[in-house]
UniProtKB/Swiss-Prot annotation:
CDD domains: DnaJ (cd06257), DnaJ_C (cd10747), DnaJ_zf (cd10719)
Localization annotation: Cytoplasm
Protein name: Chaperone protein DnaJ
List of residues binding Zn(2+) 1: 145, 148, 202, 205
SMART domains: DnaJ
UniProt keyword terms in alphabetical order: Chaperone, Cytoplasm, DNA replication, Metal-binding, Repeat, Stress response, Zinc, Zinc-finger
Length: 375
């Protein structure tokens, strides 16, 4: 099955800006996140959205994708020039290695190698993402078997050198090619490329040299993290191989939506409902912020859609570059379930105001003020 176009996946145009791509990703990642969406196939859609964002948010990867799409230009003979494509089950590195005695360097199966990286998804409340916190997580990961010290062999015994590959972890296979008979190196299937055979396996780890355990890790979540961002914990991944360094743990943050606030970068947005009288006559109201309640003066004549800004009341930048603002959008609430007296007042106001704008000799809200004040 062919891959979908990354722009189509995110629902943006090919000329979309980085901000547009980021907004689309955040919206779709929340929609399809496995912790929220339990529908079948949501996890695959989440992975598809993540893959598209990782490519289109990177300038170099995006330029490469715009030019070549999902096709790797380094494969085959066409377009991008001569590459290391498939040629009858062997590579050109193997051919030239056989003919000229050079080619790629053989990897030592017993050389130290870094352990695999791990990923952990952490769900945060809106407030915890804004202010940060200290927490402890528990992850399953492989630890070096203490019984055999990672060798995989029963205590008192040692792994033996593979007799098939001589400890190299590779076998030389002869093949007939248009260039003649050449030697192609393959991973030794007898020792699975390790160069060692374990005849007496450790009873605790079954010869693997590793045991699955759950480990508790303290995590310091920085203030200002956003949905989709990740924190790298060096050395907290899988243990290294043959004495190599451990891999890293990547903690990916998923931030739950807030019932009142919305976030865009370091800025916070919210909608403030006002009564008809408050909007017409003006008022001083208390506005909730992440940092506590703040008094906001509403001028007379304020209409739906009017915006106010509270500087420094947003989220701290995760890299320490200042503080965001809180933006307030006014929504004037039309009264419902009016009493007879309230209906009479509004009818009286309508008679004073007139029904057409050109009949009004003063501003609409001046008349509202007069009607409510009884002038």
């Amino acid at each position: 099955m062919s891959k979908r176009d990354y722009y189509e996946v995110l629902g943006v145009s090919k000329s979309a800006s980085k901000d547009e791509i980021k907004k689309a990703y955040r919206k779709l990642s929340k929609k399809y996140h496995p912790d929220i969406n339990k529908e079948a196939g949501s996890d695959e859609k989440f992975k598809e959205v993540k893959e598209a964002y990782e490519t289109l948010s990177d300038d170099q990867k995006r330029a490469h994708y715009d030019q070549f799409g999902h096709t790797d230009p380094n494969q085959g003979f066409g377009g991008g020039g001569f590459g290391g494509g498939d040629f009858g089950g062997f590579g050109f590195d193997d051919i030239f290695s056989s003919i000229f005695g050079g080619g790629t360097r053989r990897r030592d199966p017993n050389a130290p190698r870094q352990g695999a990286d791990l990923q952990y998804t952490m769900t945060l409340s809106f407030e915890d993402a804004a202010f940060g916190k200290e927490t402890t997580i528990e992850i399953p990961r492989e630890e070096t078997c203490e019984t055999c010290k990672g060798s995989g062999a029963k205590p008192g015994t040692n792994p033996e050198t593979c007799s098939h590959c001589g400890g190299s972890g590779q076998l030389n296979v002869e093949q007939n090619t248009p260039f003649g008979k050449v030697v192609n190196r393959r991973v030794c299937h007898h020792c699975e490329g390790t160069g060692k055979i374990i005849k007496n396996k450790c009873a605790d780890c079954g010869g693997k040299g590793k045991i699955k355990k759950r480990k508790k890790i303290n995590v310091t979540i920085p203030a200002g993290v956003d949905d989709g961002q990740q924190l790298r914990l060096s050395g907290q991944g899988e243990p290294g191989i043959n004495g190599g360094p451990a891999g890293d743990l990547f903690v990916v943050f998923h931030v739950r939506a807030h019932e009142f606030f919305e976030r865009d970068g370091d800025d916070i947005y919210c909608e403030m409902p006002l009564t008809f009288a408050q909007a017409a006559l003006g008022d001083e109201v208390e506005v909730p912020t992440l940092h506590g309640k703040v008094k906001l003066k509403i001028p007379a004549g304020t209409q739906t859609g009017t915006k106010f800004r509270l500087r420094g009341k947003g989220v701290q930048n995760v890299r320490g570059y200042g503080q965001g603002d809180q933006h307030i959008v006014v929504r004037v609430v039309t009264p419902t379930n009016l009493t007879d007296k309230q209906k009479d007042i509004i009818r009286e106001f309508a008679e004073v105001s007139g029904n057409l704008p050109d009949e009004q000799e003063m501003s609409f809200f001046d008349k509202v003020k007069r009607a409510f004040k009884g002038d």
